[in-house]
């Protein structure tokens, strides 16, 4: 997957202790659901459904378009106000449309205007919010 910056993307983003996690996928793939799980664990919402990706000081950042409310859509409930931050430094991409085929996969990356962002293929992954939260708070190890 390749994304250009600056741009507005159909995605959801949360901040976990200073690490921005951009959640991408088709409509109905579970982007907002994952974000809700991460918020329940302590993450803050950056933006739901649309995210502005920009380069500032040679780093990728994500912010909420000014036209969007500071809330998240909960299917079957409606729009709910949650804890938000105005922007975050992008550290991870979670791809809700792609399956991690291997138990211990090689590192995957998403190219965003020449920046390689570590990417987790998350379709059909159990306990997804817990896994993403732990990864965002720590580092992956290469053996």
Predicted regions and their residues:
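Short solvent-exposed loop/turn micro-motifs enriched in small/polar/acidic residues
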Residues: 5-7, 46, 102-103
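Conserved nucleotide-sensing/catalytic segment adjacent to the nucleotide-binding pocket
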Residues: 44-98
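Short, acidic/polar N-cap/turn motifs at the starts of alpha helices
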Residues: 11-13, 50, 107
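A contiguous binding-surface segment within folded domains or other stable secondary-structure elements
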Residues: 32, 54-58, 133
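Short active-site oxyanion
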Residues: 41-43, 116-117
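Extreme N-terminal, non-catalytic leader segments
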Residues: 1-19, 24, 56, 134-138, ...
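Conserved NTP phosphate-binding and transfer environment spanning the P-loop NTPase/kinase superfamily
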Residues: 86-143
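Glycine-rich phosphate-binding P-loop
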Residues: 17-39
């Amino acid at each position: 997957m390749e994304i250009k910056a600056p741009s507005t993307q159909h995605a959801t983003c949360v901040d976990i202790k200073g690490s921005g996690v951009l959640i991408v996928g088709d409509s109905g793939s579970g982007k907002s659901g994952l974000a809700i799980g991460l918020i329940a664990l302590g993450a803050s919402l950056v933006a739901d459904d649309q995210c502005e990706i920009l380069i500032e000081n040679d780093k990728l950042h994500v912010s909420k378009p000014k036209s969007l409310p500071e809330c998240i859509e909960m299917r079957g409930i409606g729009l709910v106000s949650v804890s938000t931050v105005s922007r975050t430094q992008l550290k991870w991409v979670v791809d809700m449309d792609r399956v991690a085929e291997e138990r211990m996969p090689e590192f995957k990356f998403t190219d965003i205007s020449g920046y390689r962002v570590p990417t987790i293929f998350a379709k059909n992954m159990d306990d997804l919010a817990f896994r993403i939260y732990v990864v965002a708070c720590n580092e992956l190890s290469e053996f």
